[in-house]
């Protein structure tokens, strides 16, 4: 019995905390490269390129290229879109972003907003988060051109 309300958000957060040790062990086993990690995460979540494209607002061809070409140019919005499509926990999302050249420093207003939304990858849809970001004048997550 807990003293806090067991709503959907708290249930998800408690579950993530309970799995923290296992999750940390698992993250140490991911490959060093972004592309290989993306492939492994998609496999674990049983997501095809099409399903991930629908959930992340990143084009299927872009996902295919990111899986196959380590040096394929991308944007922070695309990577964060993938975090949403994969429904990653905060540590998993930070791990995936950490395998890119992006540094999401909180001193930049847009980056600070992106850091805030990273915490809801497992709870919110990308559509909800994009509506919030755009209402505040920030670029939405996903690919601008779905190719």
Feature map (PLM): residue ranges:
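Recognition helix of helix-turn-helix/homeodomain-like DNA-binding domains
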Residues: 57-74, 98-99
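Key DNA-contact positions within bacterial/archaeal DNA-binding proteins
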Residues: 50, 61, 91
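A short, Lys/Arg-rich alpha-helix, primarily the initiator
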Residues: 15-47, 126-146
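Short, basic-rich loop-to-helix N-cap that marks the start of a DNA-contacting helix
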Residues: 70-84
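Conserved hydrophobic/aromatic packing and binding residues within compact polymer-binding modules
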Residues: 38, 52-53, 63-66
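Short alpha-helical "recognition helix" segments of helix-turn-helix
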Residues: 48-55, 82
